Design a protein with these regions (language model features):
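Conserved phosphate- and dinucleotide-binding cores of soluble alpha/beta proteins
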Residues: 1-40, 111-283
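N-terminal active-site beta-alpha-beta segment that forms phosphate/nucleotide-binding
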Residues: 39-122
Length: 283
């Protein structure tokens, strides 16, 4: 009977097989993920230098201008690397990094450990974490970039007939003052080379991310403009900023050809005023 559902109980089951009781996909138990112990954050391995790390480095530059009381959210994918870069540069513990699973403070991890944080100061249940996000508690968020159009809209939820869903994307972006979307400029067998402080495209991606109109609006550019949010779109070869009159191209990577590598790979023409080079030290 339906009423029997409410009579069910939870159980604690002892499991001797270590492979079936792992704390995360790649380890049995790490006490630094529970607050039982802390570890020197310098012991964490830095991410290898590639296009994704360049994007994370550019996003991490924004953290330098934030107060020590700033609260940051990091999404899955390339945004995961922002905490790694911040930690590598020695600024990770000066800000409060959070992830939607409930970790507050510490160094959020990526890959198969996404959702956990080393040396977290606190853990909340996910619903409470989202109450905090919904209430405007975040100063900045870094999230993924799958599709972007001329109005600054972002799609991460629907691609053709495939519905990925928005997850917490909408909650996180609606009331956050500074929103940063991070992703490679194109995708699908994209190959790039980083050498001598420059970026070179050796094989262009088959799929364009900057399109005339996104297939689904997960983030509304018009809503962001109405509510005076500061929005950046950071890729490995170009940086864009949303302004009142549309999406502006503000930076390109050294070594990149503006026409061939940027404008020709876009489904719309951004507003171009004063384009600067991305800092060479990012590469």
């Amino acid at each position: 009977a339906a009423s029997d559902v409410y009579k069910r109980q939870d159980y604690i089951v002892q499991v001797d097989d270590e492979t079936k009781r792992q704390q995360s996909f790649d380890c049995e138990y790490d006490p630094s993920l529970t607050g039982e112990t802390t570890i020197p954050v310098k012991a964490l391995d830095p991410a290898p230098l590639n296009a994704k790390k360049v994007i994370a480095r550019r996003a991490a530059l924004l953290l330098l201008n934030m107060s020590n009381e700033a609260v940051i959210n990091l999404g899955i994918g390339i945004p995961e690397l922002v905490s790694s870069v911040a930690n590598e540069e020695g600024i990770g513990d000066s800000l409060t990094m959070t992830v939607e699973a409930g970790a507050i403070g510490g160094v959020p991890l990526g890959g198969v450990r996404f959702g956990a944080s080393v040396n977290a100061e606190a853990y909340m249940d996910q619903a409470t974490q989202f109450d905090f996000y919904d209430g405007g508690g975040l100063d900045l968020t870094c999230l993924g970039l799958a599709e972007c159009d001329k109005d600054g809209n972002i799609n991460v939820s629907k691609f053709g007939t495939r519905i990925a869903g928005c997850g917490g994307f909408v909650n996180i972006t609606q009331n956050t003052k500074n929103v940063v979307f991070c992703g490679t400029f194109t995708t699908g067998k994209l190959r790039e080379e980083i050498k001598d402080g420059e970026l070179h495209i050796t094989q262009e991606g088959k799929v364009k991310k900057f399109v005339p109109e996104v297939g689904h609006i997960t983030f509304s550019g018009n809503y962001a403009r109405k509510h005076k949010q500061h929005v950046l779109y950071i890729t490995e070869r170009a940086v864009f900023e949303m302004k009142e009159d549309g999406v502006h191209l503000t930076e390109i990577a050294p070594g990149v050809d503006l026409q061939k590598d940027v404008l020709d790979q876009m489904g719309f023409k951004p507003i171009i005023d004063d384009v600067k080079l991305m800092p060479a030290f990012l590469f």
